[in-house]
Curated annotation (Swiss-Prot):
Key words, A-Z: Aminoacyl-tRNA synthetase, ATP-binding, Cytoplasm, Ligase, Nucleotide-binding, Protein biosynthesis
Main localization (coarse): cytoplasm
Main EC class the enzyme belongs to: ligase
Source organism (scientific name): Clostridium botulinum (strain Loch Maree / Type A3)
SUPFAM superfamilies (alphabetical): Anticodon-binding domain of a subclass of class I aminoacyl-tRNA synthetases, Arginyl-tRNA synthetase (ArgRS), N-terminal 'additional' domain, Nucleotidylyl transferase
Protein name in UniProt: Arginine--tRNA ligase
Record EC number: 6.1.1.19
Motif range ('HIGH' region): 120-130
Biological process, per Gene Ontology: arginyl-tRNA aminoacylation
Any GO MF annotation of the entry: ATP binding
HAMAP family, alphabetized: Arg_tRNA_synth
Family in the record: Belongs to the class-I aminoacyl-tRNA synthetase family.
Length: 563
């Protein structure tokens, strides 16, 4: 039984409000002794022409209370206490019947959602900052897919621009082929940095680089061959990280893909009378929207990011007819996307309202213990590998006889890092601290994983239990609170979709783990007072494990069965 929906239906019977609106207004009371659901009656004051607290009293008398233990008023709120036995039975049966599908729905059926995320620059380091966009985008992709949306995951690679002209010049002068084979990104970064050092002494290098890129734009075989090599070498390195994270994309259409589509976009902007000359550059004026102009072409005629993003948005709408197009890109780019979306609207594309920028913060290291390859950039692959190594040390200390220690350390170590990136509001900065991230206490990935493994250990020891569970035996506060929390999984997912915030699921699974451990510490499970209680509690453990697994999977984190 969906109690939130039941509350909404009962209120609808006595008001003119629609169920969808009522569900959005329903709150969870701040204290557990105040009830399970609360409806604020302020919304009805105009319709009923009475004070909200009087409306609450009247509704309490009229409302059908079947399925609830009681309905009470708390000032202007109408508070509902659910029938605990019915709720526990309904939730556990639903979880155990639906298993890996529990929490899913068909709410997004028939709707396409484009998610652009990760998007590293070719020939540049895949550093720890990139995990923000990669982890958030992957989680949103999984969450939306779980609710029936048809998602298209796009890795919008930074694979075009004048920097490739510079890289071609640098490659021809200074590349060490042996180093390139061993550490492609490191070597490409080295020669790119050297180019900038040398260009300060010799400005002719910049001219040469521009000529190289012009040749690349014109399809020169030699330049194109080098560009493809840089791209292939980079993707080979990037794929090591994607494989570690278990991430795949539906499209790798990066900036270069739109290079032949931008002239048509510029022409359309011009045809709409939006293109203005500004010191030789071509811009769209956005003064009426309190924004600086959106630059479309630089004074030398080159297109920039905005032009490419306009071309990409138009191509995606035409190709995928998206319901939403989500851009998981750092918060500093917020103005850029506002300019792009506003320009699309001015061009007459009202679907620009369906384009959403999902920003995120920065990542900082609490200390400098993580070595860097070039002194200032922390490569993501190195971070993940170090996390696995540190986790293996902890496992060797805590459980040296564990089977498949390396496999467990890999899942735990990588999962701990991803969990940290997804734990708090995405716009908050992360301070990366190994001690906290890999701790088995507190609000961490290992704590949630340990809770799951503890539950699975109980289930293995319990073996096959026969008979039908009598859920009325689950009469304690801890059992009810855990079951009620399990019943709220879909609400957490829908909140994550509404706010485009995976942390709603991360915070939820932390609360499930906490509630499970409270229950575990308060009650005997395998040594329960009788077999009926034992069976009911084992079923509660089984349902909890299922929900934790489902939630972690949505976050892109593998569970470990044993620790």
């Amino acid at each position: 039984m969906d109690y939130k929906n039941l509350v909404a239906e009962r209120i609808k019977e006595n008001t003119e409000l629609e169920v969808d609106l009522i569900e959005k207004l329903i709150e969870i009371p701040p204290k557990k002794d105040m009830g399970d659901y609360a409806f604020p009656c302020f919304q009805l004051a105009k319709t009923f022409r009475k004070a909200p607290n009087l409306i609450a009293e009247e509704l309490k008398e009229k409302i059908n209370k079947e399925g609830f233990e009681k309905v009470v008023t708390v000032g202007p709120y109408l508070n509902f206490f659910v029938d605990k036995t019915v709720l526990i039975k309904d939730v556990l049966e639903k979880v155990l019947n639906e298993k890996e599908k529990y929490g899913s729905s068909k709410v997004g059926e028939g709707k396409n959602v484009v998610v652009e995320y990760s998007s590293p620059n070719i020939a540049k380091p895949f550093h720890i900052g990139h995990l923000f966009t990669t982890a958030i985008g992957n989680a949103l992709y999984k969450i939306l897919s779980f609710e029936g949306y048809n998602c298209i995951g796009i890795n919008h690679l930074g694979d075009w621009g004048t920097q490739f002209g510079k890289l071609i010049s640098a490659y021809r002068r200074w590349v060490d082929e042996e180093a390139l084979e061993k550490d492609a990104i490191g070597e490409l970064l080295r020669i790119y940095v050297k180019f900038h050092e040398e260009a300060e002494k010799n400005p002719e290098l910049e001219k040469e680089a521009r000529l190289n890129f012009k040749k690349l734009e014109d399809g020169s075989e030699e330049e194109t061959e080098l560009w493809n090599r840089f791209k292939d070498l980079s993707l080979k390195e990037f794929n090591k990280v994607y494989d570690m994270l278990g991430i795949k994309f539906d499209s790798l259409a990066g900036e270069s893909f739109y290079s032949d589509k931008m002239d048509a976009v510029v022409q359309e902007i011009d045809d709409k009378g939006l293109l203005v000359d500004s010191n030789g550059a071509k811009v769209v004026m956005l003064d009426d929207y309190n924004m600086p102009p959106c630059m479309i072409k630089k004074s030398d005629g080159a297109t920039i990011y905005a032009t490419r993003d306009l071309a990409a948005a138009m191509y995606r709408k035409k190709t995928y007819d998206f319901h939403k197009c989500i851009y998981v890109v750092g918060t500093p780019q917020a103005l850029h996307f506002k300019q792009v979306f506003t320009t699309l609207k001015l061009m007459g594309h009202d679907w620009a309202d369906d384009c959403k920028h999902v920003g995120f913060g920065l990542v900082k290291l609490a200390n400098k213990k993580l070595s860097t390859r070039n002194g200032d950039v922390v490569f993501l692959e190195d971070l993940l590998n170090q996390s696995v190594e540190e986790t293996l040390k902890i496992i060797n200390e805590k459980n040296p006889n564990l089977k498949d220690k390396e496999g467990t350390a890999k899942k735990l170590g990588i999962g701990a890092v991803v969990f940290t990136y997804l734990k708090n509001n995405r716009e908050r900065d992360i301070v990366f601290d190994w001690k906290e991230i890999l701790s088995f206490d507190g609000e961490t990935g290992p704590y949630v994983e340990y809770s799951y493994a503890r539950g699975k250990s109980i289930l293995r020891k319990a073996g096959e239990l026969t008979g039908e569970a009598d859920y009325s035996k689950l009469s304690s506060k801890e059992e009810f609170e855990l079951a009620k929390l399990l019943g709220g999984f879909n609400d957490a997912i829908m909140n994550a979709i509404d706010k485009l915030e995976p942390a709603m699921v991360t915070r939820y699974v932390i609360e499930v783990a906490k509630a499970f451990n409270k229950f575990y510490n308060a009650h005997g499970i395998l040594n329960a007072e009788d077999n009926d209680v034992k069976l009911a509690r084992v079923k509660l453990v089984e349902a909890t494990c299922q929900v934790i697994k489902n939630a972690l999977n949505l976050l892109g984190i593998d569970v470990v069965e044993e620790m």
